[in-house]
């Protein structure tokens, strides 16, 4: 039978659910956590003290309905070289994001529930963990939708980076733009930049 120490080697982070899936009771799990002084990385998420903390994965575990977007996606897709100061996520309207934004490390955007999964993909972060993030075209739509809160030079740099990419999909971009009701604005920017 596998123990918590082996789970830590395999997963880097452990939760009571992971332990239960491997036949370890909650009692044994929390006993191991207390005896070995595991560090609490988030609500119900533990790691050994010598591991670096994967903040993106922890945020994903804290709010599984949210998708990394905006600044986080710009940086991941190499549309900007500026690493985000705060993590940006998108979730559905009505989600209580107070716990995510309370520490000032996150900014949460909201959309209609049926639009949350538009353009959602699973990517590997710097630690090799899978996290949800929007694809290039959804990221550009998010940029244009929130253009009033983005600095002009950042806005222009991200759009120019997208236009210069070989893997851009303008048809998908226009499809998403119609869903988010920004197709006229997107068309205007694309006509100028292309």
Per-region residue spans from a language model:
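Short alpha-helix boundary/capping motifs
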Residues: 9, 22-23, 64
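A short, conserved structural fragment
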Residues: 37-42
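Residue-level marker of alpha-helix boundaries and capping positions
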Residues: 6, 19-20
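Short amphipathic alpha-helical interface segments
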Residues: 1-12
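Short amphipathic alpha-helical interaction segments
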Residues: 22-34
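Nucleic-acid-binding surface
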Residues: 13-18, 45-194
């Amino acid at each position: 039978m596998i123990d918590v120490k082996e789970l830590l080697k395999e997963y880097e982070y452990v939760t009571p659910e992971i332990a239960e899936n491997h036949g370890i009771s909650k009692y044994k799990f929390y006993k191991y956590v207390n005896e070995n002084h595991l560090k609490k990385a988030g609500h119900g998420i533990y790691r050994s003290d010598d591991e670096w903390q994967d903040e993106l994965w922890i945020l994903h575990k804290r709010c599984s309905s949210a998708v990394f977007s905006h600044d986080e996606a710009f940086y991941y897709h190499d549309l900007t070289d500026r690493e985000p100061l705060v993590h940006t996520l998108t979730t559905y309207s009505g989600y209580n994001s107070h716990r995510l934004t309370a520490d000032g490390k996150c900014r949460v955007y909201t959309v209609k529930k049926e639009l949350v999964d538009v353009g959602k993909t699973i990517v590997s972060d710097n630690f090799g963990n899978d996290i949800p993030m929007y694809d290039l075209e959804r990221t550009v739509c998010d940029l244009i939708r929130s253009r009033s809160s983005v600095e002009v030079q950042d806005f222009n740099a991200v759009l120019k980076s997208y236009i210069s990419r070989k893997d851009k999909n303008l048809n998908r971009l226009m499809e998403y733009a119609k869903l988010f009701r920004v197709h006229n604005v997107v068309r205007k920017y694309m006509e100028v930049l292309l």
